[in-house]
């Protein structure tokens, strides 16, 4: 691993290590901030002792990161404007990452201190938007162009819809349990709160099978949280390494000859598709703003711009850099690897835009999606040591600081305490919803999904909600995004003035 950092001066190397420490610290905060949601119900219902529940959550968080894949990781990264990603120098890259992470850390620590289940996902996304907007203002470019609106819209849709889904499904489960699993003394046990059970039976722990269901669903929430939120940390680490230590990370240096050939074949097949459908790139070119004029005085650094008009030239350059018998990326110089990454990202971006054009068949959309996946297979990756580091940070963070947010979830959302059935319904809803989102590559908020699910169970069960707590949570939700935008944007502007 250490040989990949060869070539960096001491100053840049120290800053790089500091940036990586920031990312892992952010993930640790994410662990004790968000994973409190996973253990709140299982602790409050006395299904597990707090210490054991937290260790279990840390364990399943760890394996959620390891097995969760990378689709969410790069969905977050692609929210940044493509030109900003491709043209940032090392110093600007560090300023961007430090500003983004510091803003997220400040807000997450603040909401955790007050016990508010605010969303780490919303915080991170707001920080990314703040960077994009500040970059647009400083460079004089369009604010609309500064944001990758396609990715931002898709991610915002998932963040808005997921809490509604959580509220409705969890409430629906309670309705079904009340309707079909009650009426007898034995069945009514799951609709009690721990204090009621202790008064009547002298026991505070739930019935055996109810307890098993609570533990399994809590483990599911922790695993899904790791699979979704852990990927965001992986994406941030890769963003740092690609920007600061490009020699070993801009492409997968461990890629096999087969994987490189698959990448080249995908580019060739995309070229054939464009040749068979010449009207599509023409439509796309007409929709895009013109390329910026090139500098002729030699004083301005030439920037790399993605534009559909350059697609065939870009494809030709890739085919030149990747001959058919290439077995490794080692023969390419660092500048060639960086150039290859930029070109591949641009070709992929063009492919994604083509798939969105009206008149493109479903079959062609699936073909373009498959080609994009193959093109980026050696570009969008993460070494095992990075996945392990993020998993450890999230797992360790889970075991500290969970109590504040867990008390809010378990005791302060509803006017009555949480019943066993409500805990099961909320956790099952969150585990399945977040797990599905991770599978399709959509970042969602564990906090929002589970908090909404708990609220849904309370409303349907007739217990009502504590207005003060719910108002505080909603205010935190509403202000998280603008606060993160202003924090990261302001920090980024200050950082750029100092360098």
Swiss-Prot record:
Superkingdom field = Bacteria
Q: Name one GO molecular function term.
A: symporter activity
Q: Which reaction does it catalyse?
A: phosphate(in) + H(+)(in) = phosphate(out) + H(+)(out)
The alphabetical list of record keywords is: Cell inner membrane, Cell membrane, Membrane, Phosphate transport, Symport, Transmembrane, Transmembrane helix, Transport
- In Pfam terms, one family for this protein is PHO4
Which Gene Ontology terms of cellular component type are present? membrane; plasma membrane
Signal peptide location in the record? none
Induction info reads: May be repressed at low inorganic phosphate levels by the pho regulon.
Q: How does it sit in the membrane?
A: Multi-pass membrane protein
Q: What does the record say about the knockout? A: Disruption of the gene does not affect tellurite uptake.
**Transmembrane domains' residue ranges:** 5-25, 52-72, 94-114, 124-144, 155-175, 207-227, 233-253, 382-402, 430-450, 473-493
**Which GO BP terms, alphabetically?**
phosphate ion transmembrane transport
Location, primary (coarse class): membrane
Compartment(s) of residence: Cell inner membrane
Q: List the disulfide bonds.
A: none
Which purpose does this protein serve, as stated in its record?
Answer: Low-affinity inorganic phosphate transporter.
Sequence similarity: Belongs to the inorganic phosphate transporter (PiT) (TC 2.A.20) family. Pit subfamily.
Query: What is the official name of this protein in its record?
Result: Low-affinity inorganic phosphate transporter PitB
Q: What is the species of this protein?
A: Escherichia coli (strain K12)
Taxonomy of origin reads:
Bacteria, Pseudomonadati, Pseudomonadota, Gammaproteobacteria, Enterobacterales
